[in-house]
Amino acid sequence: MQIMVLGGGVIGVTTAYYLAEAGHEVTVLDRQKGPALETSFANAGEISPGYASPWAGPGIPLKAIKWLLMKHGPLVVRPAFDPHMWTWLVKMLRNCTTERYAINKSRMVPLAEYSRDTLKALREATGITYDERTQGTLQLFRTQKQLDGTGGDVEVLKKYGVSYEILDQDGCIAAEPALGGVREKFVGGLRLPHDETGDCKMFTEKLAELCVARGVKFEYDTTIWRVLRSRNRVANLSTSKGFKASEAYVMALGSYSAGFMRRMKRSIPVYPVKGYSITVPIKDADVAPVSTVMDETYKVAITRLGDRIRVGGTAEISGFDLRLHESRRRTLEHSVGDLFPGAGAMREATFWCGLRPMTPDGPPLIGRTELSNLFLNTGHGTLGWTMACGSAKVLADIMSNKVPEIDARALAQERYLK
């Protein structure tokens, strides 16, 4: 089958790869000059199935108020006259219950675990490298209250068979030796030994090369203006390089997917939540992180990527605003400088932001739509890198009329149509 994948980020390129592996004729369209130049460009670098959790959870509304008042708080809301923002926020608040959290978590963890295993199989089959490390993730608690509050998370990890370790100060230092110089800054941690890290952009670029070797065509510098319908199917695309037609289409446009769906009189609850990162060259490897450290207080991820440190965090709800705010940079610099002083050449750091495509309940949207030849692979939020390979394999199976290896029925658009 001829399939056109809309979007050349990590979700679009992994989708193209697994569709090509399944024998389809695939073309990828993207407005940029190459793959992974938007949201996949400089994310935090984590592949963390154990942290696959909805943002909407019990207690979040009260925590959000506290975060908004913090100097280096992890949440920023810049109100705008945007009905889609407010509709999305209301839907998210409705999911902030214990019952909904459990349901949504149960849909996310199996996909994230499957995706990590699928990535491992891909790595073994192709030899692809991307500054990857398989040394786990350490969630670092600065206060005893944070450490004592891990009970609920641990129960969920137990339920899904996710390996974990509760660590005291010495245990944290054993996992991340550089923390030995700042042991007064934290009381303990929660380590997920099977989590991984890696450079998402590097991975996507190399996978795109593997796609080309499998016959996938990439049409860059191609802006999609409209997706044109004919009754209950997509007829063709209006683009900056003329009309494009295919037998089937995959919407993998991240935060921009919702706008294209609205123009077809269809709605999906995907809204952008901006995240920031800095990439810091390592100047002293002895005091740099080994893998990923999650600073629980500031919700910042500090990740070793080769000879660089990637520091990512912040949830900024401000629509499609891509302006870089220096206050967010200071938060990231504060976290990494506090826990790993002297590790990086901070003056040489690069500052970046991207728009995470979030659903109000947490799980992504994968599968069929009301239009017979249009499929979705979007809405992964902060977990696009974690879930990319698994999501792509699931969708490739669906489009090839195969039963996916995991139950993906609850990831379909139908959950919002009930």
UniProtKB/Swiss-Prot annotation:
InterPro entries: DadA, FAD-dep_OxRdtase, FAD/NAD-bd_sf. Its EC number is 1.4.99.-. Transmembrane segments: none annotated. Its cofactor is FAD. FAD binds at residues 3-17. The keyword Flavoprotein applies. Pfam families: DAO. One of its GO terms (cellular component) is cytoplasm. The keyword Membrane does not apply. It catalyses: a D-alpha-amino acid + A + H2O = a 2-oxocarboxylate + AH2 + NH4(+). One of its GO terms (molecular function) is D-amino-acid dehydrogenase activity. One of its GO terms (biological process) is D-alanine catabolic process. Oxidative deamination of D-amino acids. Belongs to the DadA oxidoreductase family. NCBIfam families: PRK00711.1. This is D-amino acid dehydrogenase 1. It comes from Mesorhizobium japonicum (strain LMG 29417 / CECT 9101 / MAFF 303099) (Mesorhizobium loti (strain MAFF 303099)). The lineage of its organism: Bacteria, Pseudomonadati, Pseudomonadota, Alphaproteobacteria, Hyphomicrobiales.
